[in-house]
């Protein structure tokens, strides 16, 4: 079990707010944590190592040119097959994680990637070039993805209680 949180829209002390939101879900990932914060978005992750036990499996994870940022909870059962397909398209992989398959799959297929996924998952991808946020979860809802729109702010997380620390 891992967990992630995030929000759009610039706020004062975004990194501190994100840290508090992440603390609410610390039980979901005791192995490590990671953050991505810029003027547009804040994304945080709590990790429980399962597939790639190295630090290379840490999140948030980026594509090659760092234009896409991903946080992901779950397991993609067919990630090895998808990885082979993506390598054939020219994608370069730096980890053995299923999360890296998601980010390259989104680059290659966009939202159509969802039709190819087999597993239990929830994830959010931020495109820095377009300022778009794309989130999805498995079709059976095994892995949770909660979200709320509060004014101009979009919040999301693996547990709804993480929203309590956001000022909106």
Give the role of each language-model region:
Residues 1-168:
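Cysteine-centered catalytic environments shared across enzyme families
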């Amino acid at each position: 079990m891992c967990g992630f949180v995030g929000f759009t829209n610039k706020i004062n002390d975004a990194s501190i707010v994100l840290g508090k939101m992440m603390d609410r879900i610390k039980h979901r990932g005791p192995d490590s944590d990671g953050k991505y914060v810029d003027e547009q978005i804040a994304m945080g992750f709590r990790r429980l190592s399962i597939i790639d036990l190295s630090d290379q499996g840490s999140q948030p994870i980026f594509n090659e040119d760092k234009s896409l940022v991903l946080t992901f909870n779950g397991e993609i059962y067919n990630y090895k097959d998808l990885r082979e397909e993506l390598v054939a398209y020219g994608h370069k992989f730096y980890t053995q994680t299923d999360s890296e398959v998601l980010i390259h799959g989104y680059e290659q297929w966009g939202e159509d990637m969802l039709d190819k996924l087999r597993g239990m998952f929830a994830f959010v991808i931020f495109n820095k070039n377009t300022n778009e946020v794309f989130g999805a979860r498995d079709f059976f809802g095994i892995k949770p993805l909660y979200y709320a729109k509060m004014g101009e702010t979009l919040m999301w997380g693996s547990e709804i209680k993480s929203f309590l620390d956001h000022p909106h």
